Amino acid sequence: MSHNTFGHLFRVTTWGESHGPALGCVVDGCPPGLRFKLEDLQVWLDKRKPGQSRFVTQRREDDLVKVLSGVMLDADGETMTSTGTPISMLIENTDQRSKDYGEIARQYRPGHADYTYDLKYGIRDYRGGGRSSARETAARVAAGGIARLVVPGVTVRGALVQIGKHKIDRRNWDWDQVDQNPFFSPDAAIVPVWEEYLDGIRKAGSSIGAVIEVIAEGVPAGLGAPIYSKLDQDIASLLMSINAVKGVEIGNGFAAAETSGEDNADAMRMGNDGTPIFLSNNAGGILGGISTGQPVVARFAVKPTSSILTERQSIDADGKNVDVRTKGRHDPCVGIRAVPIGEAMVACAIADHYLRDRGQTGRLK
């Protein structure tokens, strides 16, 4: 299986499977001289790790990241400085229960990658889905922690804005609320609604989809290039690479199709300091594939988890009709833990374009 690497100058390769002994990543192209501590990476993995509420999988993983290369340790024994060589990171798997998947070893779960993996490669890791499992994304979050260090002054934050048909009230948006509830919701009022709704989904052994919004602030103007190297193109590509993602939009996205040209175009005025001021941000901070200096806004839709307790019609590897019912521990709404994953992907895209711009134009330091 090829294509386990993304990025141009800031390149990330992930490896490992859901039920293997460990998984991890190699970050190549990280500039030398970046100083950080392990806790600067661990904080993002802690947001993503399973078992933190009844609304996510009860698989218990500490997701403790280890940095194996690419850094030098300071005298304090904690602070690391990047050397410019590949940064390799490892996360051990400690709570696999492969026996839960014995009954579906030759069955294809509807909506899952089981069938297509077997079709393409003639073999698949049925234990938790192998590489197709969202477990793989822990390594991406670790890489995103490094990416956040690359671009000075950039803040990347995400939030869950919709579960099923239940959407947040954007008038209640408060970033301080995001880490105060199990859903990463910026709207405190929607939390009890989601709790009741997901409790019903969970008890029925079913699952539901969600929408996540990621906003990057402090992005320098001028990142990205026309046509085949657009910043929004690469953000969309990386978000689409996340397991279970079925749609991505930048700025107003699909809503722009219902908007007039007068309302959609972001009007501009010159500020007192000589810096242009945008009067709105329908473009999501990107015009012509190049960042405007406004916040970069992306949303992505995550489908319902395919592994559910409800019995469904399918086939097996022998071509027989079967009824599939998945046991094991699964997310009733995988979109919850997709919030830090989406943040990581946007951070990696911005870091890559920052380094590419610096190398091509020399205008950024």
UniProtKB/Swiss-Prot annotation:
Designated name of the protein: Chorismate synthase
Annotated positions binding NADP(+): 48, 54
Reactions it catalyzes: 5-O-(1-carboxyvinyl)-3-phosphoshikimate = chorismate + phosphate
Subunit (UniProt): Homotetramer.
Entry's family note: Belongs to the chorismate synthase family.
Entry's Gene Ontology molecular function annotations: chorismate synthase activity; FMN binding
Enzyme Commission number, as recorded: 4.2.3.5
UniProt superkingdom: Bacteria
One Gene Ontology term from the biological process aspect of the record: amino acid biosynthetic process
Record's cofactor remark: Reduced FMN (FMNH(2)).
Keyword Flavoprotein part of the UniProt annotation: yes
Cofactor: FMNH2
PROSITE patterns with a match to the protein in the record: CHORISMATE_SYNTHASE_1, CHORISMATE_SYNTHASE_3
Role according to the record: This reaction introduces a second double bond into the aromatic ring system.
Binding site for FMN: 131-133, 243-244, 288, 303-307, 329
EC class: lyase
Cellular component GO terms held in the UniProt record: cytosol
A Pfam cross-reference name: Chorismate_synt
HAMAP family in UniProt: Chorismate_synth (MF_00300)
GN (gene name): aroC
Pathway where this protein functions: Metabolic intermediate biosynthesis; chorismate biosynthesis; chorismate from D-erythrose 4-phosphate and phosphoenolpyruvate: step 7/7
